[in-house]
């Protein structure tokens, strides 16, 4: 689960964790262990070549990110689905268990032991995370993947101006241009969605129901934008005081949300036998459970692939890949979920794609201008890789 992130959001679950921390994915060998020859086995050279391949890392990152959104959409798309809190609780349980197993295997060596004092200070941030991920799944339940992806860009605007208000700074003209394109793409996407709903069933009661469903999706999406911004900005304010290291944020977020999500599920969701049968029909029950488990593991996969991408390319390349990944992510919704392909929807996807490129370019130029006068400390790979806060 972690922080479904969207790649363009500058703040993320690990941002602000101590920039000098070594990412566990970037250095697996212990100093006490002898270096093994690269050709130790028949496939040693082949795997070593893949491990240092920029193309392989980029493809792995894109596939892990796309699969996360597609699986989330699949799970919540059932016509009778109404157990979102339960789904998110399973995600958190799986992700927490995976983190602890990775720690035991030595993959997350710098994951600190649980600290109740830190947990109390971090708990309000975890509550904001619950709001973010719940509204995210509700929006994804009512909206198509392309529209969800396009509207998710609006979070960037709210976060940017929230940073200006809370932490100072400014918004560059190029960033303003990207914001305008993001708003334009969202308007086009909404218009295309409504047009497709009306033309598909005509001006009937069915059309009214379809538009009502879309309106519910837009309402949840609007709440998700502000919940995501509140979580990211609040986390940035608190995380500097916590001295969290790599993956501590992911661990605390998932662990602390488990009891909240379970209680909310028991209080607000229908656990009757009839409702469970509706949510988990026999013909899709196994695939739903597999999807729920995978979605919890996907947070680990995304973090690994992100750190891998940064290690063999650069943080700038990683940011650009995140922007470019919006296009295949939106297209995946057209392929897997039969979202309507219209001139308006294609135009919205293209404009949203361009807005992501413009925004990434503006942030790259801004960082270069900040680095030129002085030397800035390098951000850790996992701090950069976990900027996926939000989807999904």
UniProtKB/Swiss-Prot annotation:
Compositionally biased tracts (Polar residues): 29-38
Q: Write out the GO MF terms.
A: antiporter activity; GDP-mannose transmembrane transporter activity
**Annotated family:** Belongs to the TPT transporter family. SLC35D subfamily.
- Is Transport found in the keyword set? yes
Cell compartment(s), UniProt: Golgi apparatus membrane; Cytoplasmic vesicle membrane; Endoplasmic reticulum membrane
Kindly state the subunit structure of this protein.
Homooligomer.
Native source species: Neurospora crassa (strain ATCC 24698 / 74-OR23-1A / CBS 708.71 / DSM 1257 / FGSC 987)
Q: What's the protein name?
A: GDP-mannose transporter
Function, in words? Involved in the import of GDP-mannose from the cytoplasm into the Golgi lumen.
What is one cellular component GO term in this UniProt entry?
A: Golgi apparatus
Q: Which residues cross the membrane?
A: 56-76, 81-101, 122-144, 150-168, 175-198, 214-234, 249-269, 288-308, 317-337, 343-361
Which parts of the sequence lie on the Cytoplasmic side of the lipid bilayer?
A: 1-55, 102-121, 169-174, 235-248, 309-316, 362-392
InterPro entries xrefs: TPT_transporter
Please give the residue ranges for the topological domain Lumenal: 77-80, 145-149, 199-213, 270-287, 338-342
């Amino acid at each position: 689960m972690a922080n479904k992130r969207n790649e363009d959001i500058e703040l993320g679950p690990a941002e602000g964790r101590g920039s000098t921390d070594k990412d566990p994915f970037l250095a697996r060998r212990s100093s006490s262990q002898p270096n093994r020859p690269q050709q130790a086995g028949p496939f040693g050279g082949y795997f070593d070549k893949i491990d240092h391949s920029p193309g392989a890392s980029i493809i792995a990152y894109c596939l892990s990110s796309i699969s996360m959104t597609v699986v989330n959409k699949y799970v919540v798309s059932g016509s009778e689905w109404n157990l979102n809190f339960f789904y998110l609780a399973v995600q958190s349980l799986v992700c927490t268990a995976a983190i602890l197993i990775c720690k035991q295997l030595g993959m997350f060596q710098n994951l600190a032991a649980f600290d109740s004092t830190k947990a109390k200070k971090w708990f309000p941030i975890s509550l904001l995370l619950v709001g973010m991920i719940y509204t995210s799944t509700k929006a994804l339940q009512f909206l198509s993947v392309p529209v969800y992806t396009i509207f998710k860009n609006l979070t960037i605007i709210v976060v940017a101006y929230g940073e200006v208000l809370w932490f100072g700074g400014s918004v560059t003209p190029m960033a303003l241009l990207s914001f305008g394109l993001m708003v334009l793409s969202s308007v086009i996407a909404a218009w295309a969605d409504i047009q497709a709903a009306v033309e598909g069933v005509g001006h009937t009661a069915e059309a009214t129901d379809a538009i009502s469903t879309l309106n519910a999706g837009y309402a949840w999406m609007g709440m998700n934008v502000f919940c995501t911004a509140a979580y990211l900005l609040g986390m940035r304010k608190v995380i500097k005081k916590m001295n969290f290291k790599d993956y501590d944020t992911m661990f605390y977020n998932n662990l602390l949300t488990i009891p909240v999500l379970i209680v909310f599920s028991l209080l607000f969701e229908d656990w009757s036998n009839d409702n469970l049968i509706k949510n988990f029909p026999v013909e899709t029950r196994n695939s739903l459970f597999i999807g729920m488990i995978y979605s919890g593991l996907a947070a680990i996969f995304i973090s690994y692939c992100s750190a891998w991408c940064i290690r063999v390319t650069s943080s700038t390349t990683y940011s650009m890949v995140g922007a470019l990944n919006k296009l295949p992510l939106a297209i995946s919704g057209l392929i897997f979920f039969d979202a309507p392909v219209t001139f308006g929807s294609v135009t919205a996807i293209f404009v949203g794609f361009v807005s992501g490129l413009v925004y990434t370019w503006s942030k790259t130029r801004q960082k270069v201008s900040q680095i030129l006068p002085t030397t800035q400390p390098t951000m850790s790979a996992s701090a950069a890789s976990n900027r996926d806060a939000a989807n999904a």
